[in-house]
Structure formats: structure tokens, C-alpha cells
Design a protein with these regions (language model features):
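Sec-dependent, cleavable N-terminal signal peptides
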Residues: 1-14
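Mature extracytoplasmic or otherwise solvent-exposed domains
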Residues: 14-169
Length: 169
């Protein structure tokens, strides 16, 4: 019984606003060109009060001419209220709980002198498309119902199958 209660508590854990930085396991040197290192800045991701996520810019050195792909993926859940454009615009005609994702991916090209200038990356739950059963209805995330369930930020070098940098919560 205790195990079931503990599992349920973990399943409902939400990612709180705050800044998330690399841990000891965030960098995997086996998945990078030989002398890759942070030249300036440091990767971090900030979860804002509205549950949008902003990840910082930084520069990697020692990458040679190796490009990379960065990805920021967030998983959300919320109650979606569907409104009819007709007579009562203040009351939803239908509501449902929805799980959805917001994702941003970019390819970063290495510059001269073996440097990789990694730009800032962001996602927002409000940019993810919401749907209603009737295409004539307008979907809206119900205030106070939005939960950020998890997010993962990765940077993966071309020619490598796994990320060099991972920040997850």
C-alpha cells in the first residue's frame, strides 16, 4: 500500500519554477569531439512562473568543425476549456484534460577556431497547439491548471548517437 502511495506521489510531481543547472552526469565526454570544453558561459535552463522555459547561451571550444543539434522538449498537462463563439462566451461548452508537448530544435554550426556558439533556446506551453472536438470552438488553457511534468534539454554533436550535454527535470 505504501509503495502505491509513493508511486502516485512521484507520478504527480511537477517541475517547479527555478533555474536548473548541469549535474555531474550532465556532460558525457564520450559523445563529443576529443577536446570539447566550455569556453564561456554555462548551460542552464530557467522554468518561469508561466511554465515557459528559457535555456541560456554559451560557447563550447575544441569542437573542430563539428556541428551540433540542440533540442528543448517540455511535457505539459492542463485542463482545456473550449468556448463557442456564440451567445455565452464566458462559459466553456466543453472541457477536457490534455497532455501536450512543446519542442524547439536547432542546428548549431561550428565557427572558426573550433568554437560552437550555442544560442539561447526557449519553449512555451502557449505556443503548443490546443484542440477542441469542434473546430469552430476556441481552446484555452484554464487558469491554474497548467502543469509542467518534465523537460529535457540536449546538445548532440553530429556523428554521435547520444547527447554531450543533458539537463532534465
Amino acid at each position: 500500500m505504501l509503495l502505491v502511495a509513493l508511486f502516485a506521489a512521484v507520478a504527480w510531481a511537477a517541475v517547479a519554477p527555478g533555474t536548473y543547472t548541469p549535474t555531474a552526469d550532465s556532460f558525457d565526454s564520450a559523445n563529443a569531439p576529443g577536446s570539447s570544453h566550455l569556453a564561456s558561459g554555462s548551460p542552464s535552463c530557467t522554468v518561469n512562473a508561466d511554465r515557459s522555459i528559457d535555456c541560456s547561451a554559451y560557447v563550447l571550444g575544441g569542437v573542430g568543425h563539428t556541428n551540433a543539434t540542440m533540442d528543448l522538449a517540455a511535457n505539459y498537462s492542463a485542463t482545456i476549456d473550449c468556448f463557442n463563439k456564440g451567445t455565452n462566451k464566458n462559459n466553456p461548452v466543453e472541457s477536457h484534460t490534455s497532455d501536450f508537448a512543446a519542442d524547439s530544435t536547432a542546428t548549431v554550426a561550428s565557427t572558426k577556431n573550433g568554437q560552437l556558439r550555442v544560442p539561447a533556446q526557449s519553449v512555451s506551453p502557449f505556443s503548443a497547439p490546443q484542440v477542441c472536438p469542434n473546430p469552430n470552438w476556441t481552446p484555452q488553457i484554464r487558469a491554474g491548471s497548467l502543469t509542467l511534468n518534465s523537460f529535457t534539454y540536449t546538445l548532440t554533436f553530429a556523428g554521435f548517437s547520444s547527447p554531450y550535454i543533458t539537463i532534465a527535470a
